[in-house]
């Protein structure tokens, strides 16, 4: 979800598009102005021949955004009219750039040809109209879509109920037909939006300008798109839904609240507004119950890097680490599941059963994945066909999907399947076999991109088409065959069939054979005289005239037959949209289960126990992303750790672990890995551990890492406090909370006080399962006061004044953070490190406040800065060379530690 505004550099004042009737311009430009006035918020792609042209301020904006030449066409009020253009055949590439920068584009096509325009008058302008609005949430073109990412359009509905408001969201992926709706609340709204991760959010203008919701839309930036409130009218929603889905009443769709109807109405109305006359094959809106998915707030999603890292890249994310799917639909389903883990243990168990099946049946898993690799993106192909943007390859995608589905049916023919896989196979068996056979029979092997190119129907499928192709491609052979036939019929060995631009095709015989051609009434009827020459006579026949017409029209007729067949196949496919979509969803579910099974086997993951208890017991847990990164870099194995937050004895609530330990010891990794294990388990995946027992988590909160929010005037500490406040105000006993270094962004005693109070509140009020990492070692005394609080620490070893990080979690509390040692590893000057040791020693001897003055007097800062360090003796040339090779600015903590060991070894020689 790109939340930034279009980055338009400062530019000189532009020539804005005038209002209709206010400018003395050409008829063509007047037409542009009128159409632009109806689409003021979009760049207007105005079709002129083989180009889409843009004028006035649209041209200046597009020129900067696309990096194309700005030129001019005509004048307005004495000034040149700016113009730029893009070729029609490359329009998708330019649309991708514009949409990516936050623009919306109105595509204006010619809706009549020039000949028709001339019939209306010599000066008539060809009729044009907008056929489509291209927006971030309504893209269907393959070039503009990432195969593994959904492209959701979301609509926000709000209705008033007394003094309160109720909210709902509806989200559609036009490219696949997916359509869901759910109620939400004002405090959950932003979290639900981030869960769906829409490309575009439409909202009624009064709601968009509501001061109470302003913070939400400020966060979303250009993703939010205000629309007229009439689109969201819940009173007329029922009729709009019925018309769109062509049903008498939508009662069979289920019962929806007024807010849900408002959101559904807004989504459908916007689809109609942007797609004009075309209608995408949307599924019926599926209602999602509140609480059916794990609540994860936006900050936690960002901290855990589920789909993307904090820098916006998929590399390094959890999704990238676990994705082993082989289909676009499977990858999208896996991403959707990661963003919305389940809270129903039975539903989670059904998913895990499917993964377990493939984990056990490895040969079946391999065979199924081999078949799935040939599955193209059926839902997206179907959507393009329905919107009249498809081509032969989209029909080919459906054919490939049907063929793979048939192979998978054969693979599972005599196999008992778990519930989820059995339901998936039922949907696959229900795929329309008549359409499948029709596509297999009709389509050739090599398919063109565009239907207008022809050549996509298989030979033998349509007899007339075969004849037309023969005439088109083998006209000489056909003429030669007719010539031989006429020679045999007349006995004139010198008879020839020739062609010129005046007569077309004709039969030519020498003059002395004219009697054969004209000597009888039958011959006269058969051979029609066309021309007499000095030594020859020319004739035609009805057969030759028909053949000539056929040859002349063969190419057009061949293409016409193929286009008609394309439309018929498309109509048949769109008519089966519901079954095709269900079958494609089933193939995606099978892909996800098989992929997770492969992942669990290759990574040695275990099946978690997920139930309704409050358990949280992980043995040998690992961080899935970090573990793979260590393996790739060859830095050694990941150190697994246990975590047990389960209620103890007669306790009704889960435990809190107070985690202390040094910087670089692995605290943040440990925190994140347990949150990720919970997410993976409730997604229905095996988890990176030797065993795991997790009582369903209903809310997950993570406050790990922070950054400034300068745009809203919030410091790092303020951001930290806002996020911590949200956790303390919302977490219940089923929540899992991971907190890292609360209170570090302010004065020591202030920070300690806040962290101390937060732990007490989590224990006494929230009563949730939690891991709280801190450098405030004074807090470890809370373990004697709070019954469910336990001290754990990241273990280290000290050796000859240096520290070795073991990355192991054990019982107990740390009394030091080893910050000075880490500073040395980072390459701080030796004088700074030595002075830090002195300051630390004196601070640790007594109260800080009683020592600071003496510290300043003992060794002023400038004394350290000006002191020249005596060079230290180097024990060997090897040690000096090794030191010279080290660049501490480019080393990871682990690399620094390994370098330290090497230097120690050299120093001892």
From Swiss-Prot:
**Gene3D superfamilies per the record?**
1.10.1420.10, 6.10.140.430, DNA repair protein MutS, domain I, MutS, connector domain, P-loop containing nucleotide triphosphate hydrolases
Q: CDD domains, from UniProt?
A: ABC_MutS1
Q: Where is the composition biased (Basic and acidic residues)?
A: 275-290
Query: Per its record, what are the GO molecular function terms?
Result: ATP binding; ATP-dependent DNA damage sensor activity; damaged DNA binding; mismatched DNA binding
Q: Which SUPFAM superfamilies match?
A: DNA repair protein MutS, domain I, DNA repair protein MutS, domain II, DNA repair protein MutS, domain III, P-loop containing nucleoside triphosphate hydrolases
What are the annotated GO cellular component locations? cytosol
Listed binding positions for ATP are 661-668
Q: What are the recorded Gene Ontology BP terms?
A: mismatch repair
Any Pfam family from its record, for instance, is: MutS_II
This protein's UniProt keywords: ATP-binding, DNA damage, DNA repair, DNA-binding, Nucleotide-binding
* Region ranges (Disordered): 275-295
Show the NCBIfam families listed in the entry: mutS1, PRK05399.1
Q: What does this protein do?
A: This protein is involved in the repair of mismatches in DNA. It is possible that it carries out the mismatch recognition step. This protein has a weak ATPase activity.
State the family named in the UniProt similarity comment for this chain.
Belongs to the DNA mismatch repair MutS family.
Q: What is this protein called?
A: DNA mismatch repair protein MutS
Per the UniProt entry, what species is this protein from, by scientific name? Mesorhizobium japonicum (strain LMG 29417 / CECT 9101 / MAFF 303099) (Mesorhizobium loti (strain MAFF 303099))
- Tell me the gene name: mutS
